[in-house]
Each structure stands twice: as C-alpha cells, then as structure tokens.
C-alpha cells in the first residue's frame, strides 16, 4: 500500500480576494464590479450634482440647473467651453488649479461624467462576461451590449475628438440631446446618411421583431395547467416547452409564406438586427467626426438654383439645413461672434 502525504497548498492574497469578490450574495460584485460600481456611482452622482447646482452660463451662456429654474427635461450638464480644447480637465489640472467652483464653471463635470460613464458601461459589459463564464452561459449578452457602448463612445468621445473640442459633444440632458440632434442634421445632414438609415432600420426592426416574437409566444402558450391565468400554468423548472414552435411556424408561414424554422436562428436574428443597427450608426458618427459627407445630390442643387420652379424634397432638406446652420451657429457658439450677411441666409428655394 502506498500512502501519499501532500502538503496543503497555501492560498495567496489573490485567491482570498477572488473568493470574496465571487461570493454568492444578493448583488454579485466580481472583478468587473471593481470597475463598474465606482464608475457608475461617480457618473450618476456627478450628473445629479451638475443638473441640480451647476450653471452653463460660462460655457454656453445658458441656464441648465434646477437651481436656475430648469426642470427634468431642460436641465443638463453642459460640455466644456470651446477654449478648453480636448483637455481632460482634471480638477488639479492647469485649467481649474484645484478650485472646485472654477472646475464646474469651465465644464469639468461633463468630462468627469463622460469618462466615468464610458468605463462604467465597459464594466457592465465585463460583468455580463464574468457572470456568464461563472454559470456556464455563452457570452452573447455581453456581445450584444457592445452596441450601446459603441454608440455612447462614438457620440460622446469620438465625435468631439474629431471636432475642435469637447464643446461639440452632446451635453448630458434631454433637451440638450435634442439640440445635438438638430446640430448633426444642420451641419452633417445626418438623416440622409446611409449609416443613420441602417441604424434606424436596426433599432425599429429590433422593436418590431421583439413585438412579433412576444405576441407569437403568448399566442401559442400551452394550456398545461389548471391555474386561473397563463403565467401560473407552468413551472420555471419544467423540462417541457411551454409554447408551440410548430404552431408559430405554421401561423407565420401562412401570413408571410416564410417563417423561422428553429429557435436558434430566430433568436440570433433578434440579436443580430438591433446590434448591427447600433454598430452601423456608431460607424456613421465616427464618419461625422471626420466631417465625411454622404449623398450630396449636387445636380439637384444646381438645377434648383437656376430654376425657381424646380424643387425636390432633397433641396427642401438642404434649405432647412442652411437655416439650422445660420440660426444655430450664432446662438450655439456666441464666443465666435458669428454675423451672417443677409445674402447667405436661406430664402425660398434659391440656393
């Protein structure tokens, strides 16, 4: 008989921390939580602080806080002043020099929230990877969440990095985002951009697929219990299906002539459509950061300029964009002292 005497492996500090982070608790922490929770807390806290107390008078010439009379829809944390360029605006940096009030006045809170928000979203994505790995799931949730991350990073970081300063990013508020949308339309003709079209198709297509899928499952639920309502007619741990894929397939085959043949392809398509839409719109925003143009139908513009009776929906959009630029540039960038002579302002359909 052979007796093997082994020495118990000593556990290092890393193993102890790993065990504590992955302990089963009400709110899982994990290694990703070390990035997610502090960044999310600071980003949300910074936004609540900014919308409550901090003015945009010094950066945009606007009132933007509850303290100044704004409400939830009009309050915002505004982007830094154009003169700040692409500085990270550290509180201890040369701009604020440790003065918290000055830091808020020049837009330091926006940079603080945008950067911590970006890392918070990345932390949330990593959290989905980590938990999926621990419980033995595929990582498609995390892959899908890369879409919102791509849009956030492209809009709040990549776009202003391609422009003159952080000033041209969206301020963090509801009405502020609407103003940014008008800006993108007026200066980039964004709605006519094919990447925007693909993004809209992806998001609205995903919503349509979600509605169809939910309704179809509800329509084909089995009556496999004696409970009073549908939701109590099955148990979450039962091995049998609770709805009929065959019935759903026959129904949509009659409606459209085609239908998904299996659940894997169906659910992959529901994943693919909206995530692809988000990614394509993010690519489009990066293109706008580089001032790339899309779909300039110059022949129609030239003919409209020569013939007062010729007008298309495209030339009407171009006129509207000119109006947005001429009104918004002076309003939105008062520090530039823009003055537009009468002859460059849009009039009729004469471009």
Curated annotation (Swiss-Prot):
Keyword Repressor (UniProt): no
Give any single GO term for biological process: photosynthetic electron transport in photosystem II
Q: What EC number(s) does its UniProt record assign?
A: 1.10.3.9
Which free-text remark accompanies the cofactor? The D1/D2 heterodimer binds P680, chlorophylls that are the primary electron donor of PSII, and subsequent electron acceptors. It shares a non-heme iron and each subunit binds pheophytin, quinone, additional chlorophylls, carotenoids and lipids. There is also a Cl(-1) ion associated with D1 and D2, which is required for oxygen evolution. The PSII complex binds additional chlorophylls, carotenoids and specific lipids.
Q: Which UniProt keywords apply?
A: Chlorophyll, Chloroplast, Chromophore, Electron transport, Iron, Magnesium, Membrane, Metal-binding, Oxidoreductase, Photosynthesis, Photosystem II, Plastid, Thylakoid, Transmembrane, Transmembrane helix, Transport
Per UniProt, chlorophyll a ChlzD2 binds at: 116
The record lists a plastoquinone as bound by 213, 260
The reaction(s) annotated as catalysed by this protein in its Swiss-Prot or TrEMBL entry are: 2 a plastoquinone + 4 hnu + 2 H2O = 2 a plastoquinol + O2
Question: Which residue ranges does UniProt annotate as crossing the membrane?
Answer: 39-59, 123-139, 151-164, 206-226, 277-293
What is its membrane topology?
Answer: Multi-pass membrane protein
Described purpose of this protein according to its UniProt entry: Photosystem II (PSII) is a light-driven water:plastoquinone oxidoreductase that uses light energy to abstract electrons from H(2)O, generating O(2) and a proton gradient subsequently used for ATP formation. It consists of a core antenna complex that captures photons, and an electron transfer chain that converts photonic excitation into a charge separation. The D1/D2 (PsbA/PsbD) reaction center heterodimer binds P680, the primary electron donor of PSII as well as several subsequent electron acceptors. D2 is needed for assembly of a stable PSII complex.
The identity of this protein, by name, is Photosystem II D2 protein
Species in which this protein is naturally found: Pyropia yezoensis (Susabi-nori)
Q: Gene encoding this polypeptide? A: psbD
